[in-house]
Regions:
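Short beta-strands within extracellular/lumenal beta-sheet-rich domains
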Residues: 10-31
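Extracellular ligand-binding interfaces
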Residues: 43-71
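Extended, low-complexity, turn-rich repeat/linker tracts enriched in Gly/Pro/Ser/Thr and Asp/Glu
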Residues: 26-29, 38-47, 57-59, 112-114
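Extracellular carbohydrate recognition and processing domains
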Residues: 60-95
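Proprotein-processing/basic-patch segments
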Residues: 107-137
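Cysteine-clustered segments with highest specificity for TGF-beta superfamily mature ligands
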Residues: 84-112
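Short carbohydrate-recognition loop motifs
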Residues: 1-12
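Short coil-to-beta strand junction motifs in C2/discoidin
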Residues: 32, 43-50, 118-122
Length: 137
């Protein structure tokens, strides 16, 4: 069946990773925003996602410290299995460079703020960014 999701359990912090190539027309001097698309069978409660990220170029050590962006609790809308979108997670300006790979780790943070029962099903992550103008001579 379609769509396919990654399910995050309610009993322990669980992760999913994605890697995004930072192409030349992205303006890396501007912050980017990430949004998590998800649903849940639960009709009440709050879910909390965190995002960790690091950006690396070819030849750089990928085993370095990541930046953690803690999420805020998002309240379910009261209807089961409805596609929801998280609030924005900021990826800092100058955190990436053109030609880098942005490594993202999305985690359901089952802390005290996350009290939604059952799985949170993640369908994807949207990255919003600013482009640089192209000048051709």
């Amino acid at each position: 069946t379609i769509p396919t999701a990654i399910s995050f359990d309610t009993s322990a912090d669980e992760n999913a990773c994605a890697n995004v190539y930072i192409h030349d027309d992205i303006d890396c001097s501007e912050a980017m925003s990430a949004y998590i698309y998800y649903s849940a069978a639960a009709t009440s409660g709050d879910v909390t996602f965190d995002i960790d990220y690091v950006s690396k170029a070819s030849g750089e050590d990928v085993g370095t410290t990541v930046t953690d962006v803690a999420g805020t609790a998002t309240t379910t809308n009261g209807t089961a299995d409805v596609l929801e979108i998280s609030s924005a997670y900021s990826i800092a300006a100058d955190a990436c460079a053109n030609g880098d790979v942005l490594f993202l780790n999305v985690r359901r943070d089952v802390s005290a703020a996350d009290d939604m029962s059952g799985d949170a099903d993640m369908y994807g992550v949207r990255i919003d960014y600013t482009t640089r103008p192209s000048v051709k001579e």
